[in-house]
């Protein structure tokens, strides 16, 4: 296997793992990184599906005990059924809109200006929500995932719909949306992790079924390297983020989004990257 391709696979896997669960938009980062690394567009499209799968496996591993407890508790435990129902309720709106508007989103919004605007506006929204949190000066209404109501889950699910716009960030929309609707910062972050499981698994299955011909024996090694890199980096990132939100807000990520959005606009129109 070509060592240059191995390095590219490692780099893209790490980028995916580090950005998938932070409120910074993994899509924007992968587009820029993939173009700089000169990944072939079709190869990059398939590879993105694989490394996303690696990232979500990291969340499954981090929360494996909770997931097992929920699955085994479904027949008899009310808490397990309520948790599952909340995840389903929060997942359905985005899935419905994605199926309805997938082609429109890809044809209209995958361009430098929409992605850059989404990054910058998302950063501004984070600054506003964090400022609102400081002004309130009192504890958030929902202090535990188990205290989430179906209405809370629906609100977070509606917020997740904004993530269909490239550059918004699925994690950003669910975490910040959750905080806006009364979830404590860590609760919003953890619920965002759990929502990623059905969303990314579903997207992986859908894209794999649609482009199954792109998966061939020659690419298995490259995909395995990218998946492993995404898994390890995502696992480290998830653990770090849980520690970070215990004593920090998301203001730094907001400013990063704004700067990165301007960078995307610059490289998109300068010809430095090939926009997919």
From Swiss-Prot:
Q: Name one GO cellular component term.
A: plasma membrane
- What's in the misc comment field? Bacitracin is thought to be involved in the inhibition of peptidoglycan synthesis by sequestering undecaprenyl diphosphate, thereby reducing the pool of lipid carrier available.
Q: What is this protein called?
A: Undecaprenyl-diphosphatase 1
- Family per record: Belongs to the UppP family.
Entry function: Catalyzes the dephosphorylation of undecaprenyl diphosphate (UPP). Confers resistance to bacitracin.
Regarding the membrane, this protein is recorded as:
Multi-pass membrane protein
* UniProt record, GO biological process: cell wall organization; peptidoglycan biosynthetic process; regulation of cell shape; response to antibiotic
Q: Could you say which EC number(s) this protein's record lists?
A: 3.6.1.27
- Listed GO molecular functions? undecaprenyl-diphosphatase activity
Q: Which domain of life is it from?
A: Bacteria
Per the UniProt record, which residue ranges are transmembrane? 85-105, 108-128, 187-207, 217-237, 253-273
Q: Which InterPro entries match?
A: UppP (IPR003824)
Q: Where in the cell is it found?
A: Cell inner membrane
Write down the chemical reaction(s) this protein catalyses. di-trans,octa-cis-undecaprenyl diphosphate + H2O = di-trans,octa-cis-undecaprenyl phosphate + phosphate + H(+)
UniProt keyword annotations, A-Z: Antibiotic resistance, Cell inner membrane, Cell membrane, Cell shape, Cell wall biogenesis/degradation, Hydrolase, Membrane, Peptidoglycan synthesis, Transmembrane, Transmembrane helix
Q: Which gene encodes it?
A: uppP1
């Amino acid at each position: 296997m070509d060592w240059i391709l191995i390095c590219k696979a490692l780099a893209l896997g790490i980028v995916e793992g580090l950005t998938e669960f932070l409120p910074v938009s993994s899509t924007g980062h992968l587009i820029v990184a993939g173009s700089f690394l000169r990944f072939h567009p079709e190869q990059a499209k398939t590879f993105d599906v694989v490394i996303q799968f690696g990232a979500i496996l990291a969340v499954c591993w981090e929360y494996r005990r909770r997931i097992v407890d929920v699955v085994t508790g479904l027949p008899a435990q009310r808490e397990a059924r309520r948790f599952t129902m909340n995840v389903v309720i929060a997942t359905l709106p985005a899935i419905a809109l994605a199926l309805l508007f997938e082609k429109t989103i890809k044809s209209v919004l995958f361009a430098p200006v929409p992605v850059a605007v989404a990054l910058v506006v998302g950063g501004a929204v984070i600054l506003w929500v964090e400022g609102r949190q400081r002004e309130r000066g009192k504890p958030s209404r929902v202090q535990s995932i188990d205290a989430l109501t179906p209405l809370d889950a629906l609100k977070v699910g509606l917020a997740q719909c904004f993530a269909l716009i490239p550059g918004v960030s699925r994690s950003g929309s669910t975490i910040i949306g959750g905080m806006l609707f009364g979830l404590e910062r860590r609760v919003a972050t953890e619920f965002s992790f759990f929502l990623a499981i059905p969303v990314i698994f579903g997207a992986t299955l859908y894209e794999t079924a649609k482009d199954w011909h792109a998966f061939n024996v020659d690419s298995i090694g490259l995909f395995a390297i990218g998946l492993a890199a995404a898994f390890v980096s995502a696992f480290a990132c998830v653990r770090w983020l849980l520690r970070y939100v215990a004593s920090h807000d998301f203001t730094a990520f907001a400013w990063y989004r704004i700067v990165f959005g301007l960078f995307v606009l610059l490289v998109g129109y300068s010809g430095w990257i090939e926009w997919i």
